[in-house]
Amino acid sequence: MSPYVLTIMSLSLLLGTTMTLISDHWLTAWMGLEINTLAVIPLMTKPHHSRSTESAIKYFMIQATASMIILFSAIFNASTTNQWITGQISNTSASFMMTIALAMKLGLAPFHFWVPEVTQGIPLLSGMILLTWQKIAPISIFYQISPSLNMSLLMILSITSTLLGGWGGLNQTQLRKILAYSSIAHMGWMTIIIMIYPSLTILNLILYLASTITMFMVLNQSSSTKINSLSILWNKSAPNMIIITLTLLSLGGLPPLTGFMPKWLILQELINFNNIPLAMMLALSTLLNLFFYMRIIYSSTLTMFPSINNTKLQWALYSHKTILPIPTLTIISSLLLPMTPMFITLS
């Protein structure tokens, strides 16, 4: 792809997300979502392969359907309330349709089937954009309309997302599909708390973005797309293997890593609101995600292909390409748990 085209698409992604974030009118928020969708499709089809083209078409169809529902619900809300302000969606039917449309855009269950298939068919860096940057704009709309949402609907979406996100990743061997199912489960955690404590959703989103970007960058640097390809990564790049291990354990929510913080705070808020059964179901669903994270770690650290002793020293001679954001993102995704009291105070 031409550097000029890549620059235009990247700036369009930034413009679309910024428009949605700062907009207080439904039409401009919708325009931002559309710019985002149209800008990411050329990045998804960059390899000019039939699989990437198929994935881009699937993504476009899902996003176009969701955008149509968003626009229809905004018009329906305006016709009954005479309000185009983004944060005011007082009509119950419009709120229901808006929630369903945003769930489709985020890949929440039961509208999640496109996420693993699309992620698997595109390059790692395009998958990183799909599972990180493309989540910001829909969640910002969720944040703005959070007082008008239906709690029962959110509970159904979040529980099914966390359970199916964990269940779907159990028998996967493709790393992109595993990260896609991980994204579905994390979106479920963000959805359940957005009505009770919206600030926790933003905190969870930031930490999820840091961890997922770290994983994709390291996998792209090592050209790893399958679990068995990680078994030789320890010989080639021991630091990358350590980063993958820490990031996966953090995504699984194990203390004392950063990923434990949002799960801890969300469960605490749910218990404070007497949603103890819901908190228990979310906590148990995390074990499913943790299982396939541990499977990756086991395959990459405790199993190796038979090799001569000289190959075990390759990491010392391997030409490492330094990617500057990786160390910073690793620290954010692994070592911020001691700062939990500060985040509680700020929120």
UniProtKB/Swiss-Prot annotation:
Q: Which InterPro entries match?
A: Complex_I_Subunit_2, NADH_DH_su2_C, NADH_UbQ_OxRdtase_chain2, ND/Mrp_TM
Question: What Gene Ontology molecular-function terms does this entry list?
Answer: NADH dehydrogenase (ubiquinone) activity
Which reactions fall under this protein's catalytic activity? a ubiquinone + NADH + 5 H(+)(in) = a ubiquinol + NAD(+) + 4 H(+)(out)
Topology versus the membrane, per the UniProt entry? Multi-pass membrane protein
What are the entry keywords?
Electron transport, Membrane, Mitochondrion, Mitochondrion inner membrane, NAD, Respiratory chain, Translocase, Transmembrane, Transmembrane helix, Transport, Ubiquinone
Which family does the UniProt entry place this protein in?
A: Belongs to the complex I subunit 2 family.
Tell me if NAD is a UniProt keyword of this record: yes
Per the UniProt record, the source organism is Metachirus nudicaudatus (Brown four-eyed opossum)
Instruction: List the gene name.
Output: MT-ND2
Q: Pfam families of this UniProt entry? A: NADH_dehy_S2_C (PF06444), Proton_antipo_M (PF00361)
Q: Can you quote a single GO CC term?
A: mitochondrial inner membrane
Bilayer-crossing residues are: 2-22, 25-45, 56-76, 96-116, 122-142, 149-169, 178-197, 202-219, 241-261, 278-298, 323-343
Quote the function comment for this protein.
Answer: Core subunit of the mitochondrial membrane respiratory chain NADH dehydrogenase (Complex I) which catalyzes electron transfer from NADH through the respiratory chain, using ubiquinone as an electron acceptor. Essential for the catalytic activity and assembly of complex I.
Record note on quaternary structure: Core subunit of respiratory chain NADH dehydrogenase (Complex I) which is composed of 45 different subunits. Interacts with TMEM242.
Q: What is its EC number?
A: 7.1.1.2
Q: Which GO terms describe its biological process?
A: mitochondrial electron transport, NADH to ubiquinone; mitochondrial respiratory chain complex I assembly
Give the superkingdom in one word: Eukaryota
Report the protein name in the record.
NADH-ubiquinone oxidoreductase chain 2
- State where the protein is found: Mitochondrion inner membrane
Using the UniProt record, name the top-level EC class of this enzyme in a single word.
translocase
